[in-house]
Amino acid sequence: MITNSIIYFFLIFIVFSVCKKFNFFLDIKDHKHKKFASNQTNYFIGGFFIALILTYNFVEQKDYSYGLFFMSIFIIGLLADFKLFNNPKLRLIFQILLLILFVYVLDIKIPSTRIEIVDILFENNLINYLFTIFCLAILINGSNFVDGINTLLINYYIIVLGLIIFFLKDVNIDYYLINNLFSLLLIILIFNVFGQVILGDSGAYILSLFIGLTLIDLSNINNLISPYFIILLVWYPCFELLFSMIRRFASNIYSYEPDTMHLHQMILKMINDNLKFKSNNLNHFLAGSIINLYNLFILIIALNYINKTNIMLMLIFTNIIVYIIIYVVLHQKLKPNQS
């Protein structure tokens, strides 16, 4: 792992230096939510390295269908990063079409939910496929939502992969690939902390897709793990998106364009307004750390009851309540300043 990390560091440093010199892969702040988060110059090369590792693994394992699946999703994100595919509604449609195709071809299904009536429904392949597509679409786009703050998404998935590596050692999954990705994310995080390298839409899409499919596999091959522990591992990016959808619907806002009313953005604004650090990178780091430390705390508790569905449900419910309370409080405090 250490050797790989050193290699990744120098590769990213070299690519970043070239991009900085020639302004390749420069992230253009053309939306309100991006300008709100930061005006700093950064480069969306993180996703390329994730795609490189995953592509190499799929070719080596001769999983060409999975490789094509990941690269198709990656390309949609890459076109968005280059501002060649700016319509969020159209991007979502293309994502869903790809998910429909590959979920069916690769026979990707959600396993038991431990709710009898739901499991009976999931015996119908069509219903199961549709629910799987919905879950993956929410995870992919929710992850892209929270990636607006540096370190937040990368650190979140470092936590998820770290828990798999260090606490779920007896599960039959590709630990070599997971270890490599874990090492890569740690190195990307170093550059991301200083606002130099970001994942971009392409990186957020492909990373979250990998996490989602890995967790589905994890649940499928280990009946002792509660499926709600799997949900708990990805609850935050998913709920950020679901809550935003509900909020917009309740406010009669039907735009697909991103806004600055998400919880992570409110936390960042509170830090900006109250702590007044000159370093925008420090503000991002603190905002991301607050959210991730809370999630790490909850997940450490969950590890002790990994097969207890009732406790997993209680923790998920607790997360939702905490999220809503904090959101309402911050919304009231920031309301006079919000446009």
Regions of interest found by a model, annotated:
Residues 192-193, 218-221, 243, 302-308:
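Transmembrane helix-loop junctions in multi-pass membrane proteins
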Residues 73-79, 84, 91, 306-339:
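Alpha-helical transmembrane segments and their immediate juxtamembrane interface regions
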Residues 17-42, 243-281:
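Cytosolic, membrane-interface loops and tails of multi-pass inner-membrane proteins
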Residues 54-57, 284-306:
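Alpha-helical transmembrane segments and their membrane-interface junctions
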Residues 41-49, 204, 280-294:
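Select subsegments of transmembrane alpha-helices in polytopic membrane proteins
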Residues 239-247, 251, 326-330, 334:
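Membrane-helix cytosolic exit motif
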